[in-house]
Amino acid sequence: MEVQRKTVPVKKASKNGFLKSVLVFTLIVSFSVLLLGGYWIFKGLAPRPVEVSGPNGEVLMTKSSISGGQAVFQKYALMDYGTILGHGSYMGPDYTAEALKIYTEGMQDFKAEAQYGKRFKQLSDEKQSTIRNHVIREMRKNRYDRPSDTLKLTDAQVYGLHQVRAHYRKVFTKGDGWGLEPGLIKESHMPERDRAWVDSEDQITQISDFIFWTAWLSSTLRPGDDITYTNNWPYDEDAGNTMSFAAVWWSGASVTILILFVGIILFVFYRYKLGMKEAYQEGAFPVFDLDKQPLTASQVKTGKYFAVVSLLFFVQAMFGALLAHYYIEPDSFFGIDWIRELLPFSISKGFHLQLAIFWIATSWLGMGIFAAPLVGGREPKRQGLLVDILFWALIVLVGGSMVGEWLGAKGFLGNNWFLFGHQGMEYIELGRFWQVILALGMLIWLFIVFRGIKSGLKRESDKGGLIHLLFYSSIAIPLFYGAAFFFNPGTNITMSDFWRWWIIHLWVEGIFEVFAVVVIGFLLVQMNLVTKKSTVRTIYFQLTILLGSGVIGIGHHYYYNGSSEVWIGLGSVFSCLEVIPLTLLVLEAYEQYKMMKDGGHHFPYKATFWFLISTAIWNLVGAGVLGFLINLPAVSYFEHGQFLTPAHGHGAMMGVYGMFAIAVWLYTLRNITKKEAWNDKWLKIACWSLNIGLFGMVFINLLPVGFLQLKKAFEDGYWSSRAPEFLQQDVVQTLLTWRAVPDTIFLAGIVILVVFSIRALFHLRKPTHREGEALPVKDIASDE
């Protein structure tokens, strides 16, 4: 390995100037469109009127009761049980679609009784058709008056509202007969006065009003338009909701544009040779002697990070297994009632999601800490102390947030539910206080990384070089998490969802992907496997097409959540284009496989490369193919919020980000663990177990159920595909039961990683260099 002690940069002309300009231009345009689209959403939000009254002037609802109902919905973690406007979890119903069905049937019965003295279902087909058409016209007319900020409901609509209230009064007191516990919402959970976010009146009435309001906006036309606030979603012909022309047109247009850009991107890729080039000659593969590799105290301290990561991964998977079981036996766990009472579906789902983010992010943070001295060339003073502080901060964060989420969802925190408890938004369950701790933890990590790579940044003359790209991508991790602070329970649910997807799509799926692309490039250069020059060019190309498609591609989450129709066009086109960079990663996987083969039997990083190859394959299959399947507006219209969504979610979250987290986790452990304690054979078994198990989950369980659910929605209306009766069908129950097989295979792989990582703690190498001492490592800052 080369020893580089130079600290004075040599000023040279900027490299890759054109590629840099294209990337910067792409970022400016993409985020401008996204923010402008967000402003468009804000201006077109469905109103929450100051007063909602009936034909006689009696006040039925207020803005406070609607907003308070949203807070109640979030406080009891109902987004981790069912869905609202199609977003959330899949055990319970979609509350919007369910309420719309009840609201519509209530209006039909009211009209039938008024005109014929009979209930709607007792009428002849001809009379039913007359009533149905009358109800559709009445409910789709927008009676909101903007100057007075009031909404008038007709007699039939008022009756429909009362039916919705009666239904949810029963559900939230006696349970829903499926997975929702009786007596979930209690007035004793909140103080009588000065409630945080929740209105002073009865909480069940408030949540009923909120759910009814989502049904109203899904069936009421936008002013001056012929589609509803939700672009005619959910599909319910009795309510007049059918697929819009925009959904059909943009589905076809997006595929056409995809085909065009596949050709363009592939031409550019091959014409300008934008792939990574090997840095070694055939037969002269780099030799790695890990016993002689320099090691610092802070690097050794990352060992405990990965031991905790393995345990978090195991616990997260066990919660996943519990959730899968609840679909078979929703009211207990093999007859043990106290487990369901202690860990109901909603709380377990929140833990499952949060732990996934925690273990994946912690793995990436640990690798960043390890890499910092390699980049900077020395260990900063007291770096190890900062690493220890961050470690214990993460322990407090994970433990504290989980306890808080449980206490909040169970109603024990009173007015502090949002601050310390369960925030109630999928993927952002942890309370606001814990969010602050998480953000501070990421800033501490960024400071640790900056201290480690600071001298490398100074030495690298190119401000767009590999070290700078690593630093910029590190900054983006805490920066983009800031979107989680832009909304609260009082924010309109559609606007909250706009910012929530910044966390899920932009932060997890976008910035994590950016960091992964840069880190993979860094690792390959650090190991002398590829040239720095070709790697930097490749990274710029990948980031341009990744962010150019992905930033605006967030719009496929905005099709039917109350956002403006423009997002159907933007989201469909750019989400289709997201497939292209993911496809190109398969070419990278082949190159990685070839490098591993060239390394032969003695190549020490085989386990890392197995998981890097897994990452690339799942990037195409899980994120690309399965994402493309559900992102077409015409498919999403019927599928939105069904089992095909978690099929994509598992393939992308675990298949891409999870597999990559394991890759960097094993890379770091390989460098800090004694050679005699390493066993690639067991890690190979773990890799196959995780991939086979994940494949089984997705293709044997989630996809088949999702296709059946899609068919049910198309034939009988969306609400029917989300009713408990669908999940209770024999064929669905059989598929859900057989999931135990791939789940068990998957868990076996995790157990191997847990044992391996904890065992590694007792076989760590000793630091070879002290703080401030120069490390004999390849100088990534130097020009080739």
Where are these regions (language model features)?
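Membrane-interfacial, low-structure loops and terminal tails that flank and connect transmembrane helices
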Residues: 2-16, 275-302, 458-462, 595-604, ...
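Hydrophobic cores of alpha-helical transmembrane segments in multi-pass integral membrane proteins
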Residues: 20-40, 73, 81, 225, ...
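Soluble extramembrane regions of membrane proteins in the secretory/endomembrane system
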Residues: 44-246
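Cytosolic-side membrane-insertion boundary helix
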Residues: 232-256, 291-302
